Amino acid sequence: MQSTKKAIEITESSLAAATTGYDAVDDLLHYHERGNGIQINGKDSFSNEQAGLFITRENQTWNGYKVFGQPVKLTFSFPDYKFSSTNVAGDTGLSKFSAEQQQQAKLSLQSWADVANITFTEVAAGQKANITFGNYSQDRPGHYDYGTQAYAFLPNTIWQGQDLGGQTWYNVNQSNVKHPATEDYGRQTFTHEIGHALGLSHPGDYNAGEGNPTYNDVTYAEDTRQFSLMSYWSETNTGGDNGGHYAAAPLLDDIAAIQHLYGANPSTRTGDTVYGFNSNTGRDFLSTTSNSQKVIFAAWDAGGNDTFDFSGYTANQRINLNEKSFSDVGGLKGNVSIAAGVTIENAIGGSGNDVIVGNAANNVLKGGAGNDVLFGGGGADELWGGAGKDIFVFSAASDSAPGASDWIRDFQKGIDKIDLSFFNKEANSSDFIHFVDHFSGTAGEALLSYNASSNVTDLSVNIGGHQAPDFLVKIVGQVDVATDFIV
């Protein structure tokens, strides 16, 4: 999604990534840019923070009205409804959650507790609980309901003197509700309704069964299932593509919302965590074992040296390690994001032609097979292109400063390229970067120095016109000035 400070329309052409060098990196860095006065599809664009606040606009929490950022301990149960024939909404045919449903509901609860400072404890069916789960099958006695999906009540919902807060109800006539382990829309339904029970609203003022709302009725552009599983609207409205799959856990704006209500969970995944292939997360939605098994998630991670491993995918991918960014992973679009405040240090691409963008940390980026584009950004990064014709992009002296220089670990002379074109673009000159035999203090001078004994080439550049170079990249292998640079 190309972003400007004017109204834009989501089209296929505006979503097409550039294919080489700096343009590919710049396109990914601005992918799904939002807020700051932008309009998308004729709607105001909300930042991640704005969206989180809007989703919590009812200001209801289990700690009290407008009591924000405080941890909470909640109970939940699966009542058997042996002595109840009708629920508060008038639905009948009530029944207890099956073992399969209970397992999936617990996984949904766990996904909320992972990102927010919430503790859930199960209590027996007959005990009072903050959050309850139940099935219904008829909207009135003898009339089976095949039209609705589920509903829930926010904390502190009082109706006719009854506190309905935390009740969640599911239409067992829907096969995805009855068998949520095999149909991922059912799992999303559970997580969505628990979101309501915790205090989250839809991103817009709409409800199922109230008129015929569409995406045209949204309050802000990012009200889609790319940004929030509390939304009703397809991710395709904002240029995403989940390939017919649904998220199982809170997405980017849901995390902002729930952390506003209860604070962030500071103990989730504090070690060295791997997401995707070879995952050690213990979460099904953060893990994959085959090219056909897709992932849709927003990463919340509280520490450690972490890795996005998408090495088993064959499609071209675009992976961005910056917080609040989106990546195109495994043949989908905008299906992986990173929550605010999270640092993912490393990324491993697959066998397609991947674009991988690092952040300010010391990143290890591995392109794998295919013709890849790698950009470390700030920090002292290690870049591995892998097999194929790879491009290593740099855009600032701070990307690889002396004393904290990047390493290109597997440069292939005459095959790979180093892209310094942004320096020329910034200087508004086609020959700002020019190679010399020695430095004279002139800005733009570049020098290659090869050490045969170590097989390491130093690429030094004087960007600022100082007496000494202010940019240094260490390269394993030889580099040819005539063939191996884009300037």
From Swiss-Prot:
Belongs to the peptidase M10B family. InterPro entries: Hemolysin-typ_Ca-bd_CS, Hemolysn_Ca-bd, MetalloPept_cat_dom_sf, Pept_M10_metallopeptidase, Pept_M10B, Peptidase_M10B_C, Peptidase_Metallo, Serralysin-like. The active site is at E193. It is found in: Secreted. Ca(2+) 2 binds at G304, D306, T343, E345. It catalyses: Preferential cleavage of bonds with hydrophobic residues in P1'. It comes from Serratia marcescens. Ca(2+) 4 binds at N359, A361, N363, G376, G378, D381. Pfam families: HemolysinCabind, Peptidase_M10, Peptidase_M10_C. Ca(2+) 6 binds at G377, G379, D381, D399, D406. GO terms for molecular function: calcium ion binding; metalloendopeptidase activity; toxin activity; zinc ion binding. This is Serralysin. Its cofactor is Ca(2+); Zn(2+). Ca(2+) 3 binds at G350, G352, D354, G367, A369, D372. Hemolysin-type calcium-binding repeats lie at residues 348-365, 366-383. One of its GO terms (biological process) is symbiont-mediated killing of host cell. Keywords: Calcium, Hydrolase, Metal-binding, Metalloprotease, Protease, Repeat, Secreted, Toxin, Virulence, Zinc, Zymogen. Ca(2+) 7 binds at G386, G388, D390, D416. Its EC number is 3.4.24.40. One of its GO terms (cellular component) is extracellular space. Binds 7 Ca(2+) ions per subunit. Residues 1-16 form a propeptide.
